[in-house]
Curated annotation (Swiss-Prot):
One of its GO terms (molecular function) is 4 iron, 4 sulfur cluster binding. PROSITE patterns: 4FE4S_FER_1, FAD_PCMH. Its cofactor is [4Fe-4S] cluster; FAD. Binds 1 [4Fe-4S] cluster. The gene is ydiJ. Its EC number is 1.1.99.39. This is D-2-hydroxyglutarate dehydrogenase.
Length: 1006
C-alpha cells in the first residue's frame, strides 16, 4: 500500500503575507497548496525551485495590491517573481518566493487600432492569440517565437524576445510603444518615448516613479561613453537594462529600453501598447539541404546577400527526430531522403512580399546562385510556396526545441548555453570552436537556430540524474561565456539571463554598478525576482550562481532507478510547454484550456507524478512492488474505509492533490501523440489510480464505468425496460446525486439481425475463416465489435456492414468481447490485463486465418495498438484497421458523385496518434468525387465517459463551447468519427451528426 504523504509548508512570513493579501481586497486566486507549487517549480530549464505560493491576479488593481503590501517594511523579506507562459529556458520565472502568474486572467486583447496599426493587450495575452485576432485585419505582431502558441506578451517583453525574422523585424522592444507597469509599493508607471520637457516632468514626479526616471537619466548622461563601448553592435543586442537605447533614434527618452528584458526585476508589466505590421501577402520558403551542418553554416553569409526575410538552420539530429514526429507527414515532401547521401543540415530561406512576381523573381535569382555557386556542397533544394506550405515547414522547425528532448535513453540535450549570439560572419568559426569544446567532453548535441542573426541553439546532451554529468553544467557554461566574449558575442543572445546572471558583472565590468543603482531605484530591498541580472548597490545578497540552484535532476535522481525507468514519460517531460497551447482548435490539452490551471495539463500532471514518486520513495514505498502485490478487494476493504474516513476528516495527503489533477484528465491521449516528448498522461494516470485506490476506496461510479462493457450485452436483451428505467427522471436524478453519472446513453432499438441476415454476415470463428478459399479471404473482413457502436449506435454498425456488402466483401462478425478501455481509464489494470489477453488471443487466432480485422470507433480500436502492447504477458496483438485504412485498400475510383461538401471533425485520439488518418478520409471521399475538408478542432468535451461524470459537467460544456460549438454551423455538413463526439453534439445541441461511413455508403456505387 502506498504511504500517506506530508508536504513542505510555506516558510515563515509568507503565510502572514498571503493572509494580509486576502484581507486587502485581492480578487484573484491565492494558492499555497503543494500541487500548485510543485507545478510552478519548473519551466523549460534544467532548474527546479519550489515557490512558497502562487497568486493569480484578476487585473492590474490586484497586481497593485500585491506590490503595495510588498512595500511595507514588515514584508521586506518577501520575494516575488512574475510568470507568463512558463516557457523560459533559464529559470527566469522560477523562485523560492511567490509566483505572480499573470496568464490565467490577465489575457485580454483590449483594443485593436487597424488604421494606426497598434494594439493594447494585457500581459498574459498569448502571442498566437493576438495574431489570430489581428489576422482578419491583415496585421500581425512580428517577433516570431518557436513557443508562440503559449508564450505571453508579458513574457516576451520581460525577456525582450526575438526569434525567426529578427534581422528584418527586430526584437520585442522594437515593437513596444507604451507600457503600463506596477512598481514596488503599488505605484503605476506609464512609460513611453518622451521629449526632454516631458522627461523633466517625469523626474520631478514624487515617489518611486520620479526616482527611477532621475536615476535612469543620470546614468544615461554620465555613463554615455562607457555604455557605447560596453554594449555590442549585434542584431541581438544586450537584453535587460538596455542602457544603450535609453535615447531612441529621435533623441527621445524611453524607459522601456530598460524594462524590456528586465525579467520582472524592476516592476510588473501589466499592459502593453504594441506596434503591428501588415502580413506579407505571399511567401516562398527555399529548403536547402547540405552534406554537412558546417556547410549549412558557412553558406549563410552568401545566402544573406540575397536579402531574404530570414534564414533558419537545423542540424541532422533535429531533422532525424522530426522524422519520427507527428508533424513529419505534412512536410516530408520538402526533404526527400537519399540513403546514399544523407542530409546533415538544412537552411530554410524565406522570401516574402505583397507581389508574387517580385517574390518569385528574388527566388529565381536565389536559385540561380545555388546552382552556380560551388563554395559548399549542397544536396539540392525544394520550394514551399504560399502561406499554408510555409507554415507547415515552420511548424516542424518550431518543434525543434521540444524534439531534442525526445532522444532515446537518459542522456538528453539540455538547455543552459543554448542562445549564444555572435556576429553572423563569425558564426561558422565560432560554432566550430563550440563543437570542439563539447567534443572535448565527449558530449553529443543538437543545433538549430537563426543563422542570419548569428544565434544558434546548442543543447549538450547530459543525463542530469547523473551527478558527474550534471557537474559539467558549470565548467561548460564558463567556457562558453569566455568563447562568446572572444568572438565579440553574448552568452544571452535571445532567451534572457535568468539563472545565468553570474556572468553579468564580468561582462559589464565598470558599468555594472550603474545597473545596480538602477535596480536599487526600482527595488531597493531586492524583492523583485532577486538573484537575476543584478542586485541593488550595497545589497548583501549576490547573484544566483549557475551551480547554486537545485537542478531538476538533483531531485529526479532520488527516485529509485527501477521506478523512473518504469515511468519514463513522467520523468522525461522537459517542460517545453507545448501542452499549454492556447488554441482551442488544437487537441492538446482540453483540461488545461478549460481550467487555465497548470496542474490540469500534461506538464503539470507529469510534474506531480514525478514528485509523488519521489515522496513515495522517501517514505520507503516501492510503488512497483505495491502495484504487483495487491491484496484482494475484500481483504483490503477495512483499511481503505479507515483511510477514506481520515481523508474526509481532513487528513493531509499529497496523493489527494495528485488524484484531483489526474481526475481532471480526459484520457484523450492527445498528449501521447502531440507532445514532442510523447508524455503519455493516460498511461501513468491509470497506474496512479490503481495505486491510489489501493489505499482509498473507489466511488461506486468507477465500478459502473469499468463494468459497462461486461454488463451491457445482458442489459441489451431488454432494451425497452433498460431505456425506460434509465430515461426516467427519478433514476437520472438518483444517478447524478448518488453515483455521479449523468446523461447515460440509451440502448439502440434497431433490428440488427435483419442486417446480418440480409448481408449474409457470419460469425467469425477459426473454422469458418479457414474454410474460405484464398479468393474468398481477399473479399472478406472480420468486424471487431465495440460496446458503444454495437449497443448504443447499432445503425452505424449496420451501415458499415451494408457498405462492405455493397463493395463486394463478406463480413464476419467477431464474437463480442470487452475491449477493456473503460477499465484502463479508471485504473483497473489487473482486470484490464485479463480482458486484453483474452481479447488479443481471440483476435490473433482470427487474424492468422488471413482475413483483415476492422474496428469502427477510433478510441476503442486504437487500444489494440497502444494499451494492449504494454500488457505484461501479452505476446502482441494483431492490427485492427480503422475503417478508412481498410477503405483505402478496397474502395475503387468512381465517377464524381452529386455535388456537396463535407467537413471532418475527427476524434482527438485518432488524429493525434494516427496523423495520416484524416488525410485517408479525405482520399476516400475523393475516390467518390466528394470533397472532404478536415476541420481544425479541439476536444468535444466528452472523451468516453468523462463527460458523463457529474463532477465534469461544467468543464465538459466549456470544452465543447470552446471549439466544437463554433464549428457546427459552418458551410458543409460536419461529420464525426468518434462515438463520444457524436454523443456530445447530440447532448449539447440535440443534433445528430453522421459518421463519414454513412456518407460513403450513401454515395458508393453498387
Amino acid at each position: 500500500m502506498i504511504a500517506q504523504l506530508s508536504t513542505v509548508a510555506p516558510s515563515a512570513n509568507y503565510p502572514e503575507f498571503l493572509e494580509a493579501l486576502r484581507n486587502s481586497g485581492f480578487r484573484g486566486q491565492i494558492s499555497a497548496d503543494y500541487a500548485t507549487r510543485t507545478v510552478l517549480a519548473t519551466d523549460n530549464s534544467i532548474y527546479q525551485r519550489l515557490p512558497q505560493a502562487a497568486v493569480f491576479p484578476l487585473d492590474a488593481d490586484d497586481v497593485a495590491r500585491v506590490a503595495t503590501l510588498m512595500g511595507e517594511p514588515r514584508f521586506q523579506q518577501v520575494k516575488l517573481t512574475p510568470r507568463g507562459g512558463g516557457t523560459g529556458t533559464n529559470g527566469q520565472s522560477l523562485t523560492d518566493g511567490i509566483v505572480v502568474d499573470l496568464s490565467r486572467h490577465m489575457n485580454n486583447i483590449l483594443e485593436i487600432n487597424v488604421e494606426e496599426r497598434w494594439v493594447r493587450v494585457q500581459a498574459g495575452t498569448v502571442k498566437d492569440q493576438l495574431n489570430a485576432a489581428l489576422k482578419p485585419h491583415g496585421l500581425f505582431f512580428a517577433p516570431e517565437l518557436s513557443t508562440s502558441n503559449r508564450a505571453t506578451v508579458g513574457g516576451m517583453i520581460n525577456t525582450d524576445a526575438s526569434g525567426q525574422g529578427s534581422c528584418t523585424y527586430g526584437k520585442t522592444r522594437d515593437h513596444v510603444l507604451e507600457l503600463h507597469s506596477v512598481l514596488l509599493g503599488g505605484e503605476r508607471l506609464h512609460s513611453l518615448p518622451i521629449d526632454d520637457a516631458a522627461l523633466e516632468q517625469a523626474c520631478a514626479a514624487p515617489g518611486r516613479v520620479g526616482e527611477v526616471y532621475r536615476m535612469a537619466r543620470e546614468i544615461q548622461e554620465t555613463q554615455a561613453e562607457l555604455i557605447e563601448t560596453t554594449f555590442p553592435k549585434l542584431n541581438r543586442c544586450l537584453t535587460g537594462y538596455d542602457l544603450a537605447h535609453l535615447r531612441d533614434e529621435q533623441g527621445r527618452f524611453n524607459l522601456n529600453s530598460v524594462l524590456c528584458g528586465a525579467e520582472g526585476s524592476l516592476g510588473y508589466v501589466v499592459e502593453a501598447k504594441l506596434n503591428v505590421l501588415p502580413i506579407p501577402k505571399y511567401a516562398v520558403l527555399v529548403n536547402v539541404r547540405y552534406t554537412s551542418f558546417m556547410d549549412a553554416l558557412r553558406d549563410a553569409n552568401a545566402l544573406m546577400a540575397h536579402k531574404p526575410l530570414s534564414i533558419e538552420t537545423v542540424d541532422s539530429k533535429v531533422l532525424m527526430l522530426a522524422m519520427k514526429d507527428i508533424v513529419w507527414h505534412s512536410v516530408a515532401e520538402y526533404f526527400p531522403a537519399d540513403p546514399e547521401r544523407p542530409t546533415l543540415g538544412i537552411n530554410l530561406v524565406e522570401f516574402c512580399g505583397d507581389e508574387p512576381a517580385e517574390v518569385n523573381a528574388k527566388v529565381q535569382a536565389f536559385i540561380q546562385h545555388l546552382q552556380s555557386d560551388t563554395s559548399v556542397e549542397r544536396l539540392g533544394h525544394t520550394l514551399a510556396e504560399g502561406a499554408e506550405a510555409v507554415t507547415r515547414v515552420y511548424t516542424m522547425r518550431k518543434r525543434s526545441v521540444g524534439l531534442l528532448g525526445n532522444v532515446e535513453g537518459e542522456v538528453r540535450p539540455q538547455p543552459f548555453v543554448e542562445d549564444t549570439a555572435v556576429p553572423p560572419e563569425q558564426l561558422a568559426d565560432y560554432i566550430a570552436d563550440f563543437r570542439a569544446l563539447l567534443d572535448g567532453y565527449g558530449l553529443a548535441y543538437g543545433m538549430f537556430g537563426h543563422v542570419d542573426a548569428g544565434v544558434l541553439h546548442v543543447r549538450p546532451a547530459l543525463d542530469m540524474k547523473d551527478p558527474v554529468q550534471a557537474a559539467l553544467v558549470k565548467p561548460i557554461s564558463d567556457a562558453v561565456a569566455a568563447l562568446t566574449k572572444r568572438y565579440g558575442g553574448l552568452l544571452w543572445g535571445e532567451h534572457g539571463k535568468g539563472l545565468r546572471s553570474e556572468y553579468v558583472p564580468e561582462y559589464f565590468g565598470e558599468l555594472y554598478p550603474a545597473l545596480q543603482r538602477l535596480k536599487g531605484a526600482f527595488d531597493p530591498h531586492n524583492q523583485l525576482n532577486p538573484g537575476k541580472i543584478c542586485t541593488p548597490l550595497g545589497s548583501a545578497e549576490g547573484l544566483t550562481p549557475v551551480d547554486g540552484v537545485t537542478l531538476r535532476g538533483d531531485l529526479d535522481r532520488t527516485i529509485d532507478e527501477r521506478v523512473w525507468q518504469d515511468f519514463p514519460s513522467a520523468v522525461h517531460c522537459n517542460g517545453n510547454g507545448a501542452c499549454y497551447n492556447y488554441d482551442p482548435n488544437d487537441a492538446m490539452c482540453p483540461s488545461w484550456k478549460a481550467t487555465r490551471e497548470r496542474q490540469h495539463s500534461p506538464k503539470g500532471r507529469a510534474s506531480l507524478m514525478r514528485e509523488w514518486l519521489r515522496l513515495q520513495g522517501e517514505a520507503n514505498i516501492d510503488v512497483l512492488a505495491a502495484a504487483r502485490n495487491k491484496v484482494s478487494w475484500l481483504k483490503g476493504l477495512p483499511a481503505r474505509l479507515r483511510n477514506n474516513r481520515a481523508r474526509n476528516q481532513g487528513q493531509e495527503d499529497f496523493s489527494h492533490e495528485v488524484y484531483d489533477a489526474m481526475a481532471g484528465c480526459l484520457a484523450c491521449k492527445s498528449c501521447a501523440g502531440q507532445c514532442p516528448i510523447k508524455v503519455n498522461v493516460p498511461d501513468f494516470r491509470s497506474r496512479f489510480l490503481e495505486l491510489y485506490h489501493g489505499r482509498y476506496q473507489r466511488p461506486l461510479r468507477d465500478y459502473l464505468i469499468g463494468s459497462l462493457e461486461f454488463t451491457i450485452p445482458y442489459l441489451a436483451h431488454a432494451p425497452g425496460l433498460y431505456n425506460a428505467v434509465m430515461g426516467s427522471k427519478w433514476v437520472s436524478q438518483l444517478l447524478a446525486d448518488k453515483v455521479g453519472m449523468v446523461d447515460s446513453p440509451l440502448i439502440s432499438r434497431f433490428n440488427f439481425q435483419a442486417t446480418l441476415t440480409r448481408c449474409r454476415v457470419g460469425m467469425a470463428t477459426v473454422p469458418a475463416l479457414r474454410e474460405l478459399t484464398p479468393a474468398q479471404r481477399e473479399r472478406s473482413i472480420v468486424l471487431v465489435q465495440d460496446a458503444f457502436t454495437r449497443y448504443f449506435e447499432t445503425p452505424l454498425l449496420s451501415a458499415f456492414i451494408d457498405l462492405a456488402h455493397r463493395l463486394g466483401h463478406r463480413v464476419f462478425l467477431a464474437p463480442y468481447s470487452a475491449n477493456g478501455k473503460p477499465l484502463h481509464v479508471q485504473g483497473f489494470l489487473g482486470a484490464f490485463a485479463k480482458a486484453a489477453i483474452r481479447n488479443a488471443t481471440q483476435l490473433k487466432a482470427l487474424a492468422d486465418c488471413g482475413v483483415p480485422l476492422v474496428g469502427l470507433d477510433p478510441a476503442m480500436t486504437l487500444v489494440y495498438r497502444q494499451e494492449y502492447q504494454k500488457v505484461p504477458g501479452l505476446e502482441g496483438c494483431p492490427k485492427v484497421l480503422l475503417p478508412q485504412e481498410w477503405l483505402m485498400d478496397v474502395l475503387p475510383e468512381q465517377a464524381p458523385a452529386a455535388p456537396g461538401s463535407f467537413r471532418l471533425m475527427a476524434h482527438c485520439t485518432e488524429k493525434t496518434n494516427v496523423p495520416a488518418s484524416t488525410r485517408q478520409w479525405e482520399q476516400v471521399f475523393a475516390r467518390l468525387g466528394l470533397k472532404l475538408v478536415t476541420e481544425a478542432t479541439g476536444c468535444c468535451g466528452m472523451s468516453g465517459t468523462y463527460g458523463h461524470e457529474a463532477r465534469n459537467q461544467e468543464t465538459s460544456r466549456t470544452i465543447f463551447e470552446q471549439s466544437w460549438a463554433t464549428k457546427l454551423d459552418k458551410d458543409g455538413e460536419p461529420l464525426a468519427t468518434g462515438y463520444s463526439c457524436r454523443s456530445q453534439v447530440k447532448r449539447m445541441t440535440e443534433r445528430k451528426m453522421r459518421h463519414p461511413l454513412e456518407v460513403v455508403l450513401q454515395y458508393a456505387q453498387r
